[in-house]
């Protein structure tokens, strides 16, 4: 049997713990050391100076000396910085840096400086000492303020400069008797910190100028609303900057009326400005803030009252006095409201004058009349009275209805030659009739044949009352027909409305009618129901909400891709239509413009050159003294002219 691993016999042999004790025997005759006393008791006194600590004491003393020196240097540096800051911000300092250092000896610099912007104590401004420079900077610095703070022991006072509060000792106290209680900047800061800034500015404005700011302006709720005229009240402007405001604002405005008054807040500027282009309130505020170095929160910006006679009179009277500086021409609304006669006329509105204006300008649509008449309110007293009226919608409807009646009656009394002459007088000179002739030749139409057909067409000769332009697509049929329709101010009818009983109602008020792109179903309808209309004979037309009216159908121009004369489905149309074929496509230049220009001026030149050919030289029995085919229409009473 094998022996067990490891060692056996626990605690025996060399495998356990054992104790070794050295035994020294002193023998007789051994030499004893001189510095060792064998019989003396060991007290440990020989180890007292074993470690030399003199070096540590010297280092500690040096550190304490350096700390004290550092404190003194820091106090002196703080005093110098305080002196520079007080001089920079206009504060007077009466204590030397040595006194400030002595007062701070008991405190460390970190304990002396405490940031306390919103200090609850009373803040007072130090006396401003004149500096060698002129002014501080372009941006006005915050005034230095002093806060007197009494602690529980009553041995410390503080002064605040800008946003930092630095405690000073009793020896460095400022002279409280020489402190000015208020200053323009402090007042302005109070304005900025007030709960209702606008109310404070309104009150100050009324106190200075003697009237409310709201008496001069109207209110824009949105800051994005654009206007060219603005009234601004700017508070707390530096006097030097205020003197140059007239020169600074001149490149941006067409008119400027500037007034400046001094108060405890500084200079308050009241200005009426007319900019070269429309601006909103935000843009105006940014521009003025850049020029005057005043935040936009210290400004009142609103548009002026354009219809207030009192406000206009204020600007007019103050503009003539020496308290205002005026640049540019006076706005028209001030001139208009300061004329006595105009002010009297504004109170009376004359509907007949409005109708006469709409008639002279060929306006029959209610929307067009309302918009155009409102635009001339600055120069027309009756239009201004119309805008002030509470019955604008009623007046507008009555004006449009009466104008249409007058226009309809006038047109009915005019023959075709008179109407063409009237239209030619309305169009500018400078046209050329050759493009029309060249286009007809390009399409293979004989010019003399076309003139003969056009003469019968304009006279409304029976069986010759309708011209048809037929041919493939894109040959210029609609282009040619629409240009003639526009010149003669005709009307368009569409077969898509043929299911309505009133689709022919436009024929009652026009000298010419056009139906564009007639299809087979349209020709079938004409062959069934419109034979008399194509003949040029009287027909009965149904009108909406009105009784039937009997009229002679005006000349009708029709375009189509189908030739109705060659089609056997409509045999009764052959003798009632004058057909001209347009087989060639309309040519365009490289800019996609028609090669043959056909417009109102060219048609005017065409009718003037072919006037005799078309037999339009009828004797005008009703011509007035100016040579017009009829007398000028007047629906307003004339005024007697008093001669000298």
From Swiss-Prot:
* Residue window of motif Nuclear localization signal: 86-88
Q: What segment(s) does the record annotate as region DNA-binding region?
A: 180-346
Covalent cross-link (Glycyl lysine isopeptide (Lys-Gly) (interchain with G-Cter in SUMO)), residues: 552
Documented EC number(s): 5.6.2.4
Instruction: State any GO BP term from the record.
Output: DNA replication
**Statement: the UniProt record of this protein carries the keyword Isomerase:** yes
Q: Which InterPro entries match?
A: Helicase_SF3_DNA-vir, P-loop_NTPase, PPV_DNA_helicase_E1_C, PPV_DNA_helicase_E1_N, PPV_E1_DBD, PPV_E1_DBD_sf, Rep_E1_papillomaV, Znf_lg_T-Ag_D1_dom_sf
Q: Where does ATP bind?
A: 471-478
UniProt PTM comment: Phosphorylated.
Q: Which residues carry this modification: Phosphoserine?
A: 92, 96
**Pfam families for the chain:** PPV_E1_C, PPV_E1_DBD, PPV_E1_N
Localization terms from the record: Host nucleus
Domain SF3 helicase: from-to ranges: 445-595
Q: Which PROSITE patterns would you find in this protein's record?
A: SF3_HELICASE_1 (PS51206)
Keywords per UniProt: ATP-binding, DNA replication, DNA-binding, Early protein, Helicase, Host nucleus, Hydrolase, Isomerase, Isopeptide bond, Nucleotide-binding, Phosphoprotein, Ubl conjugation
Catalyses: Couples ATP hydrolysis with the unwinding of duplex DNA by translocating in the 3'-5' direction; ATP + H2O = ADP + phosphate + H(+)
Q: What does the sequence similarity comment in the record state about its family?
A: Belongs to the papillomaviridae E1 protein family.
According to its UniProt entry, the function of this protein is described as: ATP-dependent DNA 3'-5' helicase required for initiation of viral DNA replication. It forms a complex with the viral E2 protein. The E1-E2 complex binds to the replication origin which contains binding sites for both proteins. During the initial step, a dimer of E1 interacts with a dimer of protein E2 leading to a complex that binds the viral origin of replication with high specificity. Then, a second dimer of E1 displaces the E2 dimer in an ATP-dependent manner to form the E1 tetramer.
Q: How does it assemble?
A: Can form hexamers. Interacts with E2 protein; this interaction increases E1 DNA binding specificity. Interacts with host DNA polymerase subunit POLA2. Interacts with host single stranded DNA-binding protein RPA1. Interacts with host TOP1; this interaction stimulates the enzymatic activity of TOP1.
State the name under which the record lists this protein.
Replication protein E1
Organism per entry: Human papillomavirus 59
- Lineage in the entry? Viruses, Monodnaviria, Shotokuvirae, Cossaviricota, Papovaviricetes
């Amino acid at each position: 049997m094998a022996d067990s691993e490891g060692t056996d016999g626990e605690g025996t042999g060399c495998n356990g713990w054992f104790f070794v004790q050295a035994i020294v025997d002193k023998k007789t005759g051994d030499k004893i050391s001189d510095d060792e006393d064998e019989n003396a008791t060991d007290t440990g006194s020989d180890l007292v100076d074993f470690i030399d600590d003199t070096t540590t004491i010297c280092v500690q003393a040096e550190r304490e000396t350096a700390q004290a020196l550092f404190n003194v240097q820091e106090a002196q540096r703080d005093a110098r910085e305080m002196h520079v800051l007080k001089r920079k911000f206009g504060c007077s300092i009466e204590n030397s840096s040595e006194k400030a250092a002595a007062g701070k000896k008991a405190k460390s610099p970190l304990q002396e400086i405490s940031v306390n912007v919103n200090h609850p104590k009373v803040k007072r401004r130090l006396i401003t000492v004149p500096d060698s420079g002129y002014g501080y900077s372009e941006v006005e610095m915050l005034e230095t303020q002093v806060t007197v703070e009494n602690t529980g022991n009553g041995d410390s006072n503080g002064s605040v400069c800008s946003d930092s509060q630095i405690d000073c000792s009793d020896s460095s106290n400022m002279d409280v008797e020489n402190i000015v209680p208020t200053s323009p900047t402090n007042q302005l800061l109070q304005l900025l910190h007030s709960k209702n800034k606008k109310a404070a500015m309104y009150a100050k404005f009324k106190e200075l100028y003697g009237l409310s700011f709201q008496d001069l302006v109207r209110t824009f709720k949105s800051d994005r609303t654009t206007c060219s005229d603005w009234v601004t009240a700017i508070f707390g402007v530096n006097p030097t900057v205020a003197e140059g405001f007239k020169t600074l604002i001149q490149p941006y405005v067409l008119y400027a009326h500037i007034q400046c008054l001094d108060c405890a807040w500084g200079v308050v500027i009241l200005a009426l400005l007319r900019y070269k282009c429309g601006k909103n309130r935000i843009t105006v505020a940014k521009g003025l803030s850049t020029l005057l170095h005043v935040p936009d929160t210290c400004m009142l910006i609103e548009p002026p009252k354009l219809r207030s006679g009192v406000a206009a009179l204020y600007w007019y009277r103050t503009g003539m006095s020496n308290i205002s500086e005026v640049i540019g021409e006076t706005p028209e609304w001030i001139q208009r409201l300061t004329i006595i006669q105009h002010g009297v006329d504004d109170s009376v509105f004359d509907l007949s004058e409005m109708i006469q204006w709409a008639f002279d300008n060929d306006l029959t649509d209610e929307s067009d009349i309302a918009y155009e008449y409102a635009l001339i309110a600055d120069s027309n007293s009756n239009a201004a009275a119309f805008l002030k009226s509470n019955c604008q919608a009623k007046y507008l409807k009555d004006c449009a209805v009466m104008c249409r009646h007058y226009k309809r009656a006038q047109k009915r009394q005019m023959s075709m030659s008179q109407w063409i002459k009237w239209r030619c007088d309305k169009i500018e000179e400078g046209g050329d009739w050759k493009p029309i002739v060249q286009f007809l030749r390009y399409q293979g139409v004989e010019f003399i044949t076309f003139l003969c057909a056009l003469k019968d067409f304009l006279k409304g000769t029976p069986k010759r009352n309708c011209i048809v332009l037929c041919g493939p697509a894109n040959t210029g049929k609609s282009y040619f027909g629409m240009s003639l329709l526009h010149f003669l101010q005709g009307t368009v009818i569409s077969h898509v409305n043929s299911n309505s009983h009133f689709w022919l109602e436009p024929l009652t008020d026009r000298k010419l009618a056009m139906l564009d792109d007639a299809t087979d179903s349209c020709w079938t309808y004409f062959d069934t129901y419109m034979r008399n209309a194509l003949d040029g004979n009287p027909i009965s037309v149904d009108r909406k909400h009105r009784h039937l009216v009997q009229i002679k159908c005006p000349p009708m121009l029709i375009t189509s891709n189908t030739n109705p004369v060659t089609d056997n489905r409509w045999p009764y149309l052959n003798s009632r239509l004058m057909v001209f074929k347009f087989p060639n496509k309309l040519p365009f230049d490289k800019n996609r413009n028609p090669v043959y220009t056909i417009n109102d001026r060219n048609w005017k030149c065409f009718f003037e050159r072919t006037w005799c050919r078309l037999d339009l030289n009828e004797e005008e029995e009703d011509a007035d003294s100016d040579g017009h085919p009829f007398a000028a229409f007047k629906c307003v009473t004339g005024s007697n002219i008093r001669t000298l």
